[in-house]
Amino acid sequence: METILLMMAALIAFAGAIFHGLVGGKIYMSNIRESNLLPLTQSLSLVSWQMFTIFLLVSGATLLCVAMSPELVLLSYPILLGNVMGSVLFLWLGLTGHGALIKLPGMYLMLATAVLGWSGLH
């Protein structure tokens, strides 16, 4: 197990959570508030946005725990799978009519988290 790679993956996830939750959240909610969406739809959109932030935090925390306590290695596999699946979702949606997603960092950061995490485990 390469602890440094797991810690790098955790750092990417934590940095992504901070940027996504704070900076991205302000930009996103500004755009949502200026839209014609119903208040309930705006609220649900905010929950959806911040659930991804929570996923990034949980990813970082889990990978950091595994780096510090290798016996917890099994905890990392669902996190790594979630990051791979998220990256694939970004790519698929980006290629099927939502091209702006390809330009966003989410796909690349999730893929980097998964690759570094996997490499750190094997």
Regions found by a protein language model. Give the residues of each.
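Core segments of alpha-helical transmembrane spans in multipass integral membrane proteins
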Residues: 11, 15, 19-27, 40-68, ...
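Helix-coil boundary and interhelical linker segments in multi-pass alpha-helical membrane proteins
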Residues: 1-10, 62-75, 118-122
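Hydrophobic alpha-helical membrane segments
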Residues: 52, 76-90, 108-114
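Non-cytosolic membrane-interface motifs at loop->transmembrane helix junctions
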Residues: 3, 74-78, 98-109
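Polytopic alpha-helical membrane-helix bundles and their juxtamembrane interface segments
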Residues: 4-7, 30, 34, 111-115, ...
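Juxtamembrane/interfacial segments flanking transmembrane helices
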Residues: 28-29, 100
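Perimembrane loop-to-helix junctions flanking transmembrane segments
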Residues: 33-41
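Membrane-helix boundary connector in multi-pass membrane proteins
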Residues: 69-70, 88-104, 117-122
